[in-house]
Each structure stands twice: as C-alpha cells, then as structure tokens.
Curated annotation (Swiss-Prot):
NCBIfam families from the UniProt entry: uS13_bact
HAMAP family: Ribosomal_uS13 (MF_01315)
Gene symbol of the encoding locus: rpsM
Pfam families found in the cross-reference section: Ribosomal_S13 (PF00416)
One GO term of the biological process aspect: translation
Region (Disordered): 94-121
Protein task: Located at the top of the head of the 30S subunit, it contacts several helices of the 16S rRNA. In the 70S ribosome it contacts the 23S rRNA (bridge B1a) and protein L5 of the 50S subunit (bridge B1b), connecting the 2 subunits; these bridges are implicated in subunit movement. Contacts the tRNAs in the A and P-sites.
PROSITE patterns registered for this protein in UniProt: RIBOSOMAL_S13_1, RIBOSOMAL_S13_2
CC terms in the record's Gene Ontology section: cytosol; small ribosomal subunit
Subunit and partners: Part of the 30S ribosomal subunit. Forms a loose heterodimer with protein S19. Forms two bridges to the 50S subunit in the 70S ribosome.
Protein name, entry field: Small ribosomal subunit protein uS13
Species name: Paraburkholderia phymatum (strain DSM 17167 / CIP 108236 / LMG 21445 / STM815) (Burkholderia phymatum)
Keywords: Ribonucleoprotein, Ribosomal protein, RNA-binding, rRNA-binding, tRNA-binding
GO terms assigned for molecular function: rRNA binding; structural constituent of ribosome; tRNA binding
Family stated for the protein in its record: Belongs to the universal ribosomal protein uS13 family.
Length: 121
C-alpha cells in the first residue's frame, strides 16, 4: 500500500480514485494532482513507481489536507460559536444553518425523536 499524507492508499484502485481516500481531496482535485504530477490517473496504485509516488506526495503537499483541514474546519465553527452570530447559535443548538425548515424534517441535524411526554389524568 502506498502512503501519501499519512493515509494508506488502496493498491487495487486507480490513482484518481485512490487519492480520494485522503480527507480534503475529491475526484476533481485528485485528477488535477495526477495531471500536475504527470501520472496517468487510470494507472493502478500498485503499478506506480517510487518516483511517481514522490511526485504525488509533492503535489498533495501543496494543499491543506487531513488533520490540518479538519482542525481548520473545527476552528472556523468554534469562531462562529464564540462570535454568537446566527450561524454560531445554530451550530450550538444543533439545528440546520442555512434556512431549512425545522417544524418537520431536519431529523439528521436534530437527532432521533424524543418520546412525547405522557399526559397525566
């Protein structure tokens, strides 16, 4: 298995798909990295030479990926919460941020339903 940016890339996949195992790299960016490194994106990871892997590592190193990207994302959310702006408050309450309705739906963001309180007679 090839190791790029601290992630093991599966051997059986094409280079374009294998690079998407790295957090922060999707199909488009993966393709751009392969072109910049001069590696055919249809080539399997197990068929890559050490020189190809080194070029890919160098190209991936130009982007913010994995732990740094996760840290940056959480810091951005924390900043919004500290500011107390609308988006920060919605993050804090665990509700949708972008104007979606919450009277019905929004179950993914709100979590499972709580049991309704039974009425005492």
């Amino acid at each position: 298995m090839a190791r790029i940016a601290g992630v093991n890339i599966p051997n059986h996949q094409h280079t374009e798909i294998g690079l998407t195992a790295i957090y922060g790299i999707g199909r488009t960016r993966s393709r751009d990295i392969c072109v910049a490194a001069g590696v055919a994106f249809s080539k399997k990871v197990k068929d890559l030479t050490d020189a190809d892997l080194e070029k890919l590592r160098e190209e991936v190193g130009k982007f913010i990926v994995e732990g740094d990207l996760r840290r940056e994302t959480t810091m951005n959310i924390k900043r919004l919460m500290d500011l107390g702006c609308y988006r920060g408050v919605r993050h804090r309450k665990g509700l949708p941020l972008r104007g979606q309705r919450t009277r019905t739906n929004a179950r993914t963001r709100k979590g499972p339903r709580r049991a309704a309180q039974s009425l005492k007679k």
